[in-house]
């Protein structure tokens, strides 16, 4: 896409939001409580603040304010307000390619925020537990928040990820013409590194004319030992392993497709 010479500030708003899910099987009520306590501590407000602060570093944002809170009985939220310093838009890389992990990208934001909320959950029957984190990176300025996507997926290693990216508003060039997007994109996947893409099955649902992009990700490899909490698969009978595997796989597919799947 040809670089634009703008009249004034870039008024486009670019929002990246995604849900990450971690799935676990806990055999007893005590194990379920233990998993919820473990995941709640692993993703407490302090750790989430560290992750979001590093996200700001990656996209070059300047932190104005941090609000964070842990909740009882579980859950946490963090919101960071960020601002922009002067930057030459001609120096910003707007091509479609994966963003860095912890390295810094020279870019700055204005009237923008980054926030995360967590939702640990379990059911009293069946042993299935899920952890969901909702993350939103919303920016006004010359850079897409997709540059932070790689880092966030690596930090929040997840079984299922659903991602939405949209560009809203418009900005004008020096001739007065409105522009409703200022960078090329045909898939969120183009902003992911090869190692991430090799781990997940992915599908897109995009509405190009509305500048709305959606990608779903489901972990390819399934190893039961990674989903058991305080129980080893070899401690179970073959029939128990099959039942639990079927339960977990069904749960993951239902979350991935966003609908209940009838039991066969």
Swiss-Prot record:
Q: What class of enzyme is it?
A: lyase
What is catalysed by this protein? S-adenosyl-L-methionine + H(+) = S-adenosyl 3-(methylsulfanyl)propylamine + CO2
Ordered alphabetically, the record's keywords are: Autocatalytic cleavage, Decarboxylase, Lyase, Polyamine biosynthesis, Pyruvate, S-adenosyl-L-methionine, Schiff base, Spermidine biosynthesis, Zymogen
Is this entry keyworded S-adenosyl-L-methionine? yes
Q: Which GO terms describe its molecular function?
A: adenosylmethionine decarboxylase activity
Q: Which Pfam families match?
A: AdoMet_dc
Q: What is its EC number?
A: 4.1.1.50
Record PTM Pyruvic acid (Ser), positions in chain: 112
Q: Which InterPro entries match?
A: AdoMetDC_fam_prok, S-AdoMet_deCO2ase_bac, S-AdoMet_deCO2ase_core
GO biological process assignments: spermidine biosynthetic process
Q: Does the keyword Lyase apply?
A: yes
Pathway entry: Amine and polyamine biosynthesis; S-adenosylmethioninamine biosynthesis; S-adenosylmethioninamine from S-adenosyl-L-methionine: step 1/1
Where is the site labelled Cleavage (non-hydrolytic)? Answer: 111-112
Assembly = Heterooctamer of four alpha and four beta chains arranged as a tetramer of alpha/beta heterodimers.
Under HAMAP family, the record lists: AdoMetDC_2
- Stated name of the protein: S-adenosylmethionine decarboxylase proenzyme
Give the organism's phylogenetic lineage: Bacteria, Pseudomonadati, Pseudomonadota, Gammaproteobacteria, Enterobacterales
């Amino acid at each position: 896409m040809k670089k634009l010479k703008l009249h004034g500030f870039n008024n486009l708003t670019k929002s990246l939001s995604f849900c990450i899910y971690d799935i676990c099987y806990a055999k007893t009520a005590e194990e379920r409580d233990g998993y919820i306590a473990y995941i709640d501590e692993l993703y407490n407000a302090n750790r989430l603040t560290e992750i979001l602060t590093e996200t700001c570093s990656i996209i070059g944002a300047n932190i104005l304010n941090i609000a964070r809170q842990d909740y009882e009985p579980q859950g946490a939220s963090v919101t960071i307000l960020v601002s922009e310093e002067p930057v030459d838009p001609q120096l910003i890389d707007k091509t479609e390619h994966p963003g860095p992990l912890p390295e810094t990208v020279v870019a700055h934001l204005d009237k923008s925020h980054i926030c995360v909320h967590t939702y640990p959950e379990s059911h009293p029957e069946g042993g299935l537990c899920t952890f969901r984190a909702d993350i939103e990176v919303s920016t006004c300025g010359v850079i897409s928040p997709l540059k932070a996507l790689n880092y966030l997926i690596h930090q929040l290693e997840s079984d299922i990820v659903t991602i939405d990216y949209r560009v809203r508003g418009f900005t004008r060039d020096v001739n007065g013409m409105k522009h409703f997007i200022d960078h090329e994109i045909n898939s969120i996947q183009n902003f992911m590194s090869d190692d991430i893409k090799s781990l997940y099955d992915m599908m897109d649902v995009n509405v190009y004319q509305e500048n709305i992009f959606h990608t779903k990700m489901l972990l390819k490899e399934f190893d039961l030992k990674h989903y058991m909490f305080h129980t080893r698969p070899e401690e179970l009978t073959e029939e128990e392993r099959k039942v639990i595997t079927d339960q977990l796989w069904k749960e993951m597919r239902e979350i991935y497709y966003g609908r209940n799947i009838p039991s066969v």
